[in-house]
């Protein structure tokens, strides 16, 4: 049971002021930051943005002014917060998260939040939650998750980049390590960091110093062209760091919509049909310690997701662009048995309440829940608290490098420390 909704009529928790501003994200592009003030507390939230985005995502509002930031400014979204949204929310109890989120959705009057902007709405939604937690003097994870918030997720760390996240010829977007054999999150982070550094040395020796240049999410981006090159490097790094393939597994984010064209998938220098691509994944799973595959097919290929989920029944098949954290699309997937895990991105849907609804639907139907960052992040750590609040099995927030990535991992260290003996590291 969370603290949300346990409000008594008190002016101490009423929203006094909302202020938004334009800040920079980790890719040097503008994004929205929002401050929410009450007599008893304050909340601040920064909104992330994606590089590979699903077409069904909630829409972030960009100014399209070519004279500012190449058209990527967010002053319109900022203005919407400071005028339209603030006017409607002033005086409301900051603890009424769902009421506030639903009011913003009604104000927007579109299915994809394109009027006010998902970046405007989400910034307010997250800042409201933070202000409520601060006003109640409780940690955000405890405010959102209540007494059930005591599990720490397994980090799935993007240590080797391809696709839209790098400038190489790898079709698969992310190659991740998952220290699932750790006993604590603290130990998991250490394992991940050790493997990351060993991997860097392996890549530099084989491909040269430029191979340790990093992508958007802190992972290395070597000049590779085939998935097996990347997987071999990961397997070698895990072993040389002193760990086994049962202690540390591998995750893939294919982001297949990005290499799907004319009903074929361009990967490893070949063009494959959906059945051929499925055989390709099966072969990889049989050859490497792969625990999870995210977005293995085009974002509308529900039937192909279903077929792969049935074929690789003991592998975590993750829907990201497939579901876009949307309960209608998730419900379709559940009914079909398409995928068995949800990638939860709050900015895909645009409010805390809707993200929690998606997480609850996934969990009720036996789906693994993986909380995720975006390729363009800020130093905001809200998703770390959310992952604990909803009891997510995994968190995906980049390599153990770059400040906007380590901010989330470091917050999880603090949460584990705060929980003390009741903290439980998820066993996959």
Swiss-Prot record:
The protein's annotated catalytic reaction(s) are: (2R)-2-phosphoglycerate = phosphoenolpyruvate + H2O
Swiss-Prot/TrEMBL cofactor(s)? Mg(2+)
- Keyword tRNA processing found: no
Pathway of this protein? Answer: Carbohydrate degradation; glycolysis; pyruvate from D-glyceraldehyde 3-phosphate: step 4/5
Q: Pfam families, alphabetically?
A: Enolase_C (PF00113), Enolase_N (PF03952)
Subcellular location, record wording = Cytoplasm; Secreted; Cell surface
State which Enzyme Commission number(s) the record gives: 4.2.1.11
The gene designation is eno
Q: Which UniProt keywords apply?
A: Cytoplasm, Glycolysis, Lyase, Magnesium, Metal-binding, Secreted
What biological function has been recorded for the protein in this entry? Answer: Catalyzes the reversible conversion of 2-phosphoglycerate (2-PG) into phosphoenolpyruvate (PEP). It is essential for the degradation of carbohydrates via glycolysis.
Q: Cite the active-site annotation.
A: 217 (proton donor), 345 (proton acceptor)
Query: What's the name of the protein?
Result: Enolase
Q: What class of enzyme is it?
A: lyase
Q: Where does the protein principally reside?
A: cytoplasm
Q: Which InterPro entries match?
A: Enolase (IPR000941), Enolase-like_C_sf (IPR036849), Enolase-like_N (IPR029017), Enolase_C (IPR020810), Enolase_CS (IPR020809), Enolase_N (IPR020811)
Binding, (2R)-2-phosphoglycerate: 173, 345, 374-375, 396
| Family affiliation | Belongs to the enolase family.
Q: Paste the cofactor note.
A: Binds a second Mg(2+) ion via substrate during catalysis.
Q: Which GO terms describe its molecular function?
A: magnesium ion binding; phosphopyruvate hydratase activity
Give residues annotated as binding Mg(2+): 253, 294, 320
Q: Name one GO cellular component term.
A: extracellular region
A GO BP entry is:
glycolytic process
